[in-house]
Each structure stands twice: as C-alpha cells, then as structure tokens.
Design a protein with these regions (language model features):
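Anaerobic metallocofactor- and corrinoid-dependent redox/one-carbon enzyme cores
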Residues: 1-181
Length: 181
C-alpha cells in the first residue's frame, strides 16, 4: 500500500497547488498485497486500521475510505456481501473517518445492476453494525502498530526514491524490482 499512498500524497499535493481540497480515499479491502504478504491472515482489522492511522498521522484532512469499503471481501451471496460491507463501515467509523463509500450487496460484488432490495439489505446491515458498535471501537492487535510503521517508512522510501530520480513511474518500477529480489 505504501506505493499507492505515496502516489495519493503526490496527487493531494498537486490538488493543493490548484487550490483544491483533496480528500484521501484509502481502500479498506482485501488486496493482492495483503494476500501475498499474509497481512490479513489473522484478521482484517489490523491492516485496515493501520492504513487509516497512517493517513491520520501524515495529513490534516478528512479521510474517506471507499471504492467501496470491503472490496474483494464480497461474494455473490447478498447476506455475506451486506455483512462484510457493514463490518468495514463499523470499523471505519470506529476509527474516526469522515465518511465511507459503500455499495449495495449486488453492486459490491459484480458491479452489476443495483436492485432496491440489495440496497436496502446493505443499508440495514450498516445501520445495525453502527448501532452494535455505538461509541465503542475495535481493538487491534500489536501487529497493527508494526504494519502502520512499515507503511509509513515505505511511503518515505518511495517519496525519497521519486525525489532522487525525478520520475514517478520509473521510481515505482525500481522499487518493485528491488522488492522482488
């Protein structure tokens, strides 16, 4: 995630130069990186909270995870899809995000047509999950802080490489090559 986050930071800096008010939208999902490196083998809380914490530490702006939350944790089964969306929404809200993008249970998995019932299923699941957590929070394991530090130092390394080379795409290629060896 550190390469993506470095790219988002660069885009935010460009947005600020254009007098925009950029809002980072980190993914709360199960991505190939997490799968390959086993970052979510134990739970989905630590990595997602670590990613949100990195943003909250390095930028003074609202954080809005999405596209949608829970991406790649959904299946075609509507109840499961609504449930994973609701769990991710509760996790995001307990971490203090400003907003989160959700998708209806049929759209979340297939990006297909959205039915009214699927939309209602997901909204009810999110409502119940938020009510369940209330003012409580999820308790990350000690691994969360280690992941956060790893992401943060990875972002710094990427930005240093980009500054040295002066070319974002070439820098990412160099970083990818050095990580695979």
């Amino acid at each position: 995630p550190h390469k993506t986050f470095a790219g988002l930071l660069i885009m935010m800096a460009l947005g600020l130069k254009l007098n925009a008010k950029p809002i980072p939208k980190p993914l709360m999902c199960l991505s190939p990186y997490m799968t390959i490196y086993g970052r979510m083998d134990d739970n989905m809380i630590d990595m997602n909270l670590a990613k949100l914490a990195v943003w909250q530490d390095i930028v003074d702006t609202p954080v809005w995870p999405g596209e949608p939350i829970g991406f790649m944790t959904h299946t075609p089964e509507r109840v499961q899809s609504s449930m994973t969306t609701a769990l991710h929404a509760a996790l995001a809200c307990s971490a203090g995000v400003t907003a989160a993008t959700i998708a209806s249970s049929d759209e979340a998995y297939s990006k297909g047509p959205i039915s009214s019932q699927a939309r209602v299923d997901t909204l009810r699941a999110v409502k119940d999950a938020l009510r369940f957590v209330g003012n409580g929070a999820f308790l990350p394991t000690a691994e969360c802080e280690l992941i956060k530090e790893e992401i943060h130092s990875g972002i710094i390394d990427v930005l240093k490489t980009i500054a040295k080379r002066g070319d974002f795409v070439a820098s990412i290629s160099v970083i990818a090559t050095s990580q695979s060896s």
